[in-house]
Structure formats: C-alpha cells, structure tokens
Swiss-Prot record:
Its EC number is 3.2.2.9. Catalyzes the irreversible cleavage of the glycosidic bond in both 5'-methylthioadenosine (MTA) and S-adenosylhomocysteine (SAH/AdoHcy) to adenine and the corresponding thioribose, 5'-methylthioribose and S-ribosylhomocysteine, respectively. Also cleaves 5'-deoxyadenosine, a toxic by-product of radical S-adenosylmethionine (SAM) enzymes, into 5-deoxyribose and adenine. The gene is mtnN. It comes from Anoxybacillus flavithermus (strain DSM 21510 / WK1). InterPro entries: MTA_SAH_Nsdase (IPR010049), Nucleoside_phosphorylase_d (IPR000845), Nucleoside_phosphorylase_sf (IPR035994). PANTHER family: 5'-METHYLTHIOADENOSINE/S-ADENOSYLHOMOCYSTEINE NUCLEOSIDASE (PTHR46832), 5'-METHYLTHIOADENOSINE_S-ADENOSYLHOMOCYSTEINE NUCLEOSIDASE (PTHR46832:SF1). This is 5'-methylthioadenosine/S-adenosylhomocysteine nucleosidase.
C-alpha cells in the first residue's frame, strides 16, 4: 500500500519527515513531497501550504504524480466540541466547507454546487485510526465532523454562526475539505487526523502559537501508529 500524508505547515510535517527512511524530496509548484518508507510502509509526505487553494493544488499534484492508495491529512485544528481540550485529537467522519454559501439556489450551507454537502471519510481508515488511538494515553480521541474555511476562527460571532450551521461540529481548520473534495473527484479514500491547538474563539491566536507543537506531536504520533496498522 502507498500511503500519502498531508500537512500544511512545517511544524505539522517535520516530526514525520525525520522518521522517513530512504527519503527523497521533490518540489513542484513550491510544494514539498518526501517519498520513502515509514516503519517499512511506502509513504509520500506532502507539505501543502496553508489554505484551501494550496491544499487543493498540491493534493491534485500528489494524486497525479504519486498515485497513493489512501490519503491521511494531519495537523492542527481549533476545537468546537465542548468536551475537548487543547492536545486532544479529532478523527473525521465527515468534512465540510464552513465558508461556502450557495443556499440561495437550494444547496445546503457549505455545499459546493455539483459536490456532496459533506465528504465522508473512508470507514476502513476511520477504523484504523480508532484502533491506533487505543495505544495513546492521557488525551481524548474523538471522531466527528471537521469543517474547513480560509479564515482563522478568532471572532466569537463567526464561531457562533458556524456552530449554528453545524451543531455536530468537532473542529475547524483550513485545508481538509479542499483535500477531501479532490480525493472525492479522484475516488481516493481519505481521513483527517487533527490535534487541537486552540479552542475556537477563546484567545485562539495566543493558544495556537503556544500549543501548535503539542498538537503536531499528538497528530504525528497517531498518524505513525495508523501507518503501521494499515501496513499489517
């Protein structure tokens, strides 16, 4: 199995990159692709850049050039579920855009015309993530809806609006729905693994800078365990 792992920022890929054996680097359109083996599994690690356009562009290049069997999106997120704390992990069941509004034409809020209202993560990958999460102690691992938009969620009014639109929302970030949409078009299974670096709307900019490394460590740990689970 050829496993693709996508992180937006240097902090989100650095830990896994250092663990890739026989690593080779390819740069396309300012996106970095690292190929090699992780605990014996064939992997390609992509540093996509931040935001939906960078994520969609780089994921398209990834799928065209490297043809992975599955895609895992990793990194940090802002927490929405009241039960979760900084450092906890969310496994996606579904992913949605929280900044798309074509409701005037009868579409669901967050739905891009011609696309599903929500993008369902692959059940096998969700199960592999849950099985792997059983080996991690001292943090909560939840599964649920993750929403994506090209804004950092620091405004309490915006947080309240998004929460109203998606009452079942667990976390928000800036790439996953774009990655999911490209995977949908290519018919490639995906899952999103995000550790919380902040709680949306609650001094989130300060918390993000302080806890990004902690979030990256937790999400990278689960992704590595998951790679081993998938490679059995």
């Amino acid at each position: 199995m050829n496993i693709a792992i996508i992180g937006a920022m240097e902090e989100e890929v650095a830990i896994l990159r250092e663990k890739i054996a026989n690593r080779t680097e390819t740069t396309v359109a300012n996106c970095s692709f690292y190929s090699g083996t992780l605990d014996g599994a064939n992997v390609v690690l992509l540093k996509s850049g931040i935001g939906k356009v960078n994520a969609a562009m780089s994921t398209t290049i990834l799928l065209e050039r490297f043809a992975p069997d599955v895609v895992i999106n990793t990194g940090s997120a802002g927490g929405f579920a009241p039960s979760l704390n900084v450092g906890d992990i969310v496994i996606s069941t579904e992913v949605v855009h929280h900044d798309v509004d074509v409701t005037a034409f009868g579409y669901a809020y967050g739905q891009v015309p011609g696309m599903p209202a929500r993008y369902a993560a692959d059940e096998r990958l969700i199960q592999a993530a849950e099985t792997s999460a059983a080996h991690i102690r001292d943090i909560q691992v939840a599964k649920g809806l993750i929403a994506t938009g090209d804004s950092f969620m620091h405004d309490p009014a915006r947080v309240d609006f998004v929460r109203t639109q998606f009452p079942d929302l667990y976390a928000v970030e800036m790439e996953a729905a774009a990655i999911a949409q490209v995977c949908h078009q290519f018919n490639v299974p995906f899952v999103v693994i995000r550790a919380l670096s902040d709680i949306a709307g609650k001094e989130s900019n300060v918390s993000f800078e302080q806890f990004l490394q902690k979030a990256a460590l937790h999400s990278s740990e689960l992704v590595q365990l998951m790679v081993n689970e998938l490679n059995k």
